[in-house]
Amino acid sequence: MGDMKTPDFDDLLAAFDIPDPTSLDAKEAIQTPSEENESPLKPPGICMDESVSLSHSGSAPDVPAVSVIVKNTSRQESFEAEKDHITPSLLHNGFRGSDLPPDPHNCGKFDSTFMNGDSARSFPGKLEPPKSEPLPTFNQFSPISSPEPEDPIKDNGFGIKPKHSDSYFPPPLGCGAVGGPVLEALAKFPVPELHMFDHFCKKEPKPEPLPLGSQQEHEQSGQNTVEPHKDPDATRFFGEALEFNSHPSNSIGESKGLARELGTCSSVPPRQRLKPAHSKLSSCVAALVALQAKRVASVTKEDQPGHTKDLSGPTKESSKGSPKMPKSPKSPRSPLEATRKSIKPSDSPRSICSDSSSKGSPSVAASSPPAIPKVRIKTIKTSSGEIKRTVTRILPDPDDPSKSPVGSPLGSAIAEAPSEMPGDEVPVEEHFPEAGTNSGSPQGARKGDESMTKASDSSSPSCSSGPRVPKGAAPGSQTGKKQQSTALQASTLAPANLLPKAVHLANLNLVPHSVAASVTAKSSVQRRSQPQLTQMSVPLVHQVKKAAPLIVEVFNKVLHSSNPVPLYAPNLSPPADSRIHVPASGYCCLECGDAFALEKSLSQHYGRRSVHIEVLCTLCSKTLLFFNKCSLLRHARDHKSKGLVMQCSQLLVKPISADQMFVSAPVNSTAPAAPAPSSSPKHGLTSGSASPPPPALPLYPDPVRLIRYSIKCLECHKQMRDYMVLAAHFQRTTEETEGLTCQVCQMLLPNQCSFCAHQRIHAHKSPYCCPECGVLCRSAYFQTHVKENCLHYARKVGYRCIHCGVVHLTLALLKSHIQERHCQVFHKCAFCPMAFKTASSTADHSATQHPTQPHRPSQLIYKCSCEMVFNKKRHIQQHFYQNVSKTQVGVFKCPECPLLFVQKPELMQHVKSTHGVPRNVDELSSLQSSADTSSSRPGSRVPTEPPATSVAARSSSLPSGRWGRPEAHRRVEARPRLRNTGWTCQECQEWVPDRESYVSHMKKSHGRTLKRYPCRQCEQSFHTPNSLRKHIRNNHDTVKKFYTCGYCTEDSPSFPRPSLLESHISLMHGIRNPDLSQTSKVKPPGGHSPQVNHLKRPVSGVGDAPGTSNGATVSSTKRHKSLFQCAKCSFATDSGLEFQSHIPQHQVDSSTAQCLLCGLCYTSASSLSRHLFIVHKVRDQEEEEEEEAAAAEMAVEVAEPEEGSGEEVPMETRENGLEECAGEPLSADPEARRLLGPAPEDDGGHNDHSQPQASQDQDSHTLSPQV
């Protein structure tokens, strides 16, 4: 019989998942001969090669692999010629075994207890200790993975590289390793199929050296493997002797021996530590390419009856073979299968391994999972030194469809498949590791690949030295494997420098073309050759990221989810009388396959609202809003048709409410597939309608004699159809905006014709053509039409954010917006390229990753949303301003409120509906007359607009505010309108429309830097409007108002604000809501009010002016029309008797004290006295009587009678405000005085000349009651 390639030890490690042998009992694997047909355990003969291959399960738990049949040339002659060369034994994986004596019957000297299956733990004492010299490395083999998704860990990698083989029937003294060149007989004979039992005692005399690190690790691993256990080489030959006499009675010994052999691999490190990472992919991919390119007919077991053993079950629990294949009675069964079944649960995916050709498996478990397709690889080394492989897939039986797996786990095998032959490297398609390993890819595999993903997630015991690779970890994400990941990425991944956060739509050719072509070729080959196998699905979206965020998963779910409803098929046969022409296939949606009979229906299909998807398209440089995935894919298809690759970032996917799903908005059939967000004053995003918006016409019809309509453009001399077309001609927007910005007022004009008409406004030249509607106006009315009717100065320059489309009025606002919303600040480590969001995270990173480095502060770096990174803030600011001219857009600001509009018709509609327009021509004439007559104050620096006057002056002349609004609104709006009247530079007499332009003009033209709020009347400027108002009030407001109290009889203090006057009246006079309409007075500049300087108690005398009440001068402001006014009900009268008869009705109780001067009531006499003294300046009666007596005595002694006063000189003090009536003395009776009441003002006119000088205690002219 022929011989078979010896499997490399680390290749065998990659195929199986072996638990820690210290936790296993060897007796657990024992099966009696009577149970071998019912139990899934199969007690085959002991094969140490297969036992050793169990040791690498922990190295790649997620790497599915397939054990293969290696066809090699017969080596019987060479091995028979070399069987006398016995050297110190080496394990065929490069590990040193014990140096046994060259006794040809050495294997017969083993302990009989071990031969009978007892525990072999006592056997190492009989062997020589292992040697510690450096070992040659055998790393030529790599696992070959099958392109099927449900291949968890399988036996693989036999025969990828040519190595020396031994004869299947070794001589009795076959304890030593036999060497010899391999190339002598590689191509001599067509080799029949062999199985794993042909692999014995092989040594490669010329191994390829490993790198130093890997060699040392290899050597250390080999020593650690052999030292604590018995010599595996001797055990292997002992197993060989048992194999020739394989009987059912040896099953106990086999199981025990195998369990003992498991201890040999407990400390074997994973394959990743033994092999360089850069050689892991090429061999596997070469096998896949050969498998796809050359489909060689499978050689069945019946064609080669002598060689039907091909590892019938060391891997997939002996369940991958076909139950219909006959069992070979001579086939010894693998001990790995029995051990695998004894230590692995049947439902553990990692215990499922597939043999390469298990059609002739001796037994099949009834509950075994579906079979994995097998691969047969023929390896031939040519004379030139190249290695050629022929890969043939052995398909499962067609009568068992459950054995056809779905998907492909190629990525796991490719990511772990090493190869050291540079000639065998094949470029690896990027989508394989993305789909198979799920290395940070958000999409993973589709629903068909769920079984593979679940199998990778399952956990099982592993070797103690084999670290697990977590699911979803990117290559190189584990600590300690940086070199491997770097080599893997450098040698295998496609050179696609994709943005981090960028999502690429692969189904629209958004991955590199070579990758997409490879995927297409592979899919087509599999469809032609293997229709029964489910093809690997290419993911639609690639997320180049270490970990997929939740929003990306939702985004992928939206894009990848299948249609919940069947495809819509319309009725393409309309009635004949409908005269509807329908295409043969209707109007079909290229994204989902739905077809429609009408084009409008297709447009409504693209405009349906199902989900809120907001992405930033890097090609369009703006944020797009989609409400269904068809519109998103259609937008990507538009880019694909131009040869571009759509990349989108800043994902925002969220559901929409049911009330927002159905919006009654007409959908234009020519609207783009990606409707922008709805237009708003703040964002300024257009709806993207294909038809131009209608022109904005004037707010109201102009007076006929003031304007003249023309249908010819005076700028380009183009004849128009009507005035609407002329207005649209002046308002059309051109794509080229260079040279359309006015240098005087910085206004951005829509086109050249409008720009020329606008320039003549500043030059004051005719013809006076409106830049908005194109009409001709007379010079006197031109500014009125331009400002009030067409709102030309509502045009402003806005700056649109290229990232989100938000429009700002200034560059400073745009810069702050970008820095806050679209700029990310990171703290970069000073020793490595890692960057973190916070400084504390960077410090923790430095402490853990760079503990020996001196402490250095982290560096701030700035990342723009376009993925550019800057290490200085000024660089990113320069990056913001590099394309400022491209961000300028024209917006329209309402002159009455701060709202912004993108379209001029929207502004006009807003003004009409919110602020109103003139109702008739009379108002227009009044507007015109006010414009002609109003002018600014001389000597002030108030900027005026030429040739018409300010809007505020014209609006103030209107009878009811701006075109029909109430007077109250007119007063409120008068002040804001003053700020919008424009500015005139006093140095160059240039007029600018707004404050910002005035500040910019002063800085550019005259080199003066003004603050944000300059004063119109002087050269000062301020930062806040409050400071400006205070400055104007204190320095420029020469005409001031003061407010006096009309209820105070004497000279009362003035109040600068009405609120202070209201407080005074409420507190002093008890009136809550006084009428202040007649209380204000204008204070002359630099002067004082006469009442302010009056004495508080003026002395009555001859100099008193006639015609005043009680001989005192009473101002009309102080005294209203009525002398007596009731404080309770505002009753007023000039008659004192009438007033005294009125106030008792407000007296609730007779015991209540009531003021006879104002009618207010008090609970006690003391309160009334205090009120009389404070408000009416009337003292108590006793004090008044004493003062009157003292004054009378003084008058008798000193005073002389005046002008015929007679002999009797009564002392008329008028302290109570009651004048003498017809020369009668004042009655002393209080009741009589109360009933008498105050005399009219006319009665006091005759006795003014006889009134003596008042005493110093007289306080008021009002009537004082007797208490």
From Swiss-Prot:
Composition bias, Acidic residues: 1199-1210
Biased amino acid composition, Polar residues: 476-488, 1250-1267
Job description of the protein: May be involved in transcriptional regulation.
Residues in C2H2-type zinc fingers: 587-612, 615-639, 711-731, 740-764, 768-790, 799-822, 827-850, 892-915, 983-1006, 1013-1036, 1043-1069, 1124-1146, 1153-1176
Protein's organism: Homo sapiens (Human)
Pfam hit, one: zf-C2H2_11
Disulfide bond residue pairs: none
GO biological process assignments: negative regulation of insulin receptor signaling pathway
InterPro entries xrefs: Zn532-like (IPR045914), Znf-C2H2_11 (IPR041697), Znf_C2H2_sf (IPR036236), Znf_C2H2_type (IPR013087)
Full protein name: Zinc finger protein 592
Disordered as annotated region, ranges: 1-62, 124-153, 205-280, 295-488, 673-696, 918-970, 1195-1267
Compartments, as annotated in UniProt: Nucleus
Compositional bias (Low complexity): 345-369, 456-465, 925-936
